[in-house]
Amino acid sequence: MKAVYLCLCMLAAFCFSAAALPADCSQVIVGSADGWNSSHVQLSLLEKGPRGWVMVKGPFPARLGKSGLVWGRGVSMPPSGGPVKKEGDLRSPAGIFELGGVYGTVPVPQKKRSMPYRRITPRDMWVDDPASPLYNQHFVLKHDPVTPWEFKQQMKLNDYAHSLKLFIRHNAASGREKPVPGAGSSIFFHIWRRDGGAPTAGCTAMSEENLRAMIAWLDPSQHPLYILLPAMEYLRLRGAWGLP
């Protein structure tokens, strides 16, 4: 079954668009995974200067979804005919993604140009219910959670791995575009479990030290993006993006 899945992903990869990155993008996080069915990835932080793209940190290890990768919905749309991200499939979305805000239960030092940060409270929700009009969106209750549904959607408060996280804008609301129900929700960069000994449910996880360094480096005015692909696909496409 995994062999069939791998073939479908590889065939779809040849249809994946390698269009130029946005002109105002000068920061990129590159995730180079061991393969479509691997939960292991190497992350690198790249910045564009007068002489082109240079690596400012990495590569360093991180973990992906337990079942590996699948095409996601971001700046790039999934290739036609390829397997796509679904809610609960334990796969991390592959492609090119914008970044959202930082959320956490711990303080984050703020600089002049920082990613927006919100301190999580018991009223902060992130909806993973495909039947909800607020699917894959953050909202704040006007009261403390009461119903089982509200408790289920509550952002994690007492979980070290989720004490600091950065939203990856997979299947995210944008202008009039709403998230596609069931196409995957709550995809973040966050702290890994068991010092990297455990995969995720679809997020990208790393050490707290590396996560904090990455968040401190990011500058929203530089339109940072996350590119996540199997290593062989990244090597095939990086030239079109001018990346090392």
Q: Where are these predicted regions, by residue range?
A:
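Positively charged n-region of N-terminal signal peptides that target proteins for export
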Residues: M1-V4
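Bacterial N-terminal signal peptides
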Residues: C7-C15
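Cell wall/extracellular polymer interaction/catalysis modules
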Residues: A19-A201, E209-P244
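A conserved hydrophobic position in a structured secondary element of the catalytic/binding core
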Residues: M206
